[in-house]
């Protein structure tokens, strides 16, 4: 039934956006998981198989009788819960078309590492050496699992929660993540959930969305510019794809727009 619903939804989306060029990328699902179960975020073999099935349904829907740009459009697929863990990423089965590996598939992962700093409010400081090693392991796993096989990856969500205004510490995190993303050739998307609180975890507001008319001049401004500035500094500190093999780094250039 879920497969039928996914097909019906994506058929409408695909038809509507068929004539939009390759700047439009479709992502089949967002953090698909067994909500409410004690294994909601870790999953198991049955969970992994279910998501692989739904990813195949998604690709079949877009590629079958494809109109406009849909025959070659880039399609993003997540693993279970969009995890970036070694177990979760290893379980991802790439979709096929007519028995061959589907073209223009991008794996989507989400990463909030270390979780005690990025999602919760139990860790207020970021230690570049210790915590940076955790971030590096995430990207190294992405490299070994996908990039070394010529499979592109987008980190579709990442971020660090605001804990009592620890913006200098978040800036250290931002620099580290952006530097790794640049070195491994993995685009990242910063998650903004609009939560402007300063405690309780998952306070991921980055853009000010003012509703008070007196604050209209501040609307859509960046809330924590020092953290976003650190992202650019991290990006500019390394060459794109420099952690990859020479062949892979050259191949990456062909998928950049």
Question: What positions do the PLM features span?
Answer:
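Aromatic-rich peripheral "rim/lid" segments of glycoside hydrolase catalytic domains that contact
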Residues: 165-257
């Amino acid at each position: 039934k879920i497969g039928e619903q996914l097909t019906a939804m994506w058929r409408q989306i695909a038809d509507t956006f068929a004539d939009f060029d390759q700047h439009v990328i479709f992502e089949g699902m967002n953090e698909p998981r067994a909500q409410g179960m004690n294994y909601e975020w870790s999953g198991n073999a049955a969970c992994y198989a279910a998501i692989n099935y739904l990813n195949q349904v998604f690709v079949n829907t877009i590629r079958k009788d494809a109109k406009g740009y849909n025959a070659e459009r880039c399609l993003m697929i997540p693993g279970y819960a969009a995890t970036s863990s070694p177990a979760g990423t290893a379980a991802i089965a790439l979709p096929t078309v007519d028995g061959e590996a589907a073209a223009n598939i991008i794996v989507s992962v989400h990463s909030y590492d270390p979780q005690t700093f990025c999602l919760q409010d139990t860790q207020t400081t970021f230690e570049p050496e210790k915590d940076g090693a955790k971030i590096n392991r995430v990207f190294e796993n992405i490299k070994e699992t996908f990039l070394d096989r010529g499979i592109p990856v987008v980190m579709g969500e990442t971020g660090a929660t605001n804990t009592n205004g620890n913006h200098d510490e978040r800036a250290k995190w931002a620099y580290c993540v952006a530097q790794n993303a640049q070195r491994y050739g993995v685009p990242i998307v910063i998650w903004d959930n609009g939560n402007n609180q300063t405690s309780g975890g998952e306070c991921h507001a980055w853009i000010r969305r003012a509703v008070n008319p007196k604050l209209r001049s501040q609307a859509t401004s960046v809330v924590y510019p020092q953290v976003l500035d650190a992202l650019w500094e991290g990006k500019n500190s390394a060459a794109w794809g420099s952690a990859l093999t020479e062949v892979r780094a050259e191949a990456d250039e062909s998928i950049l727009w």
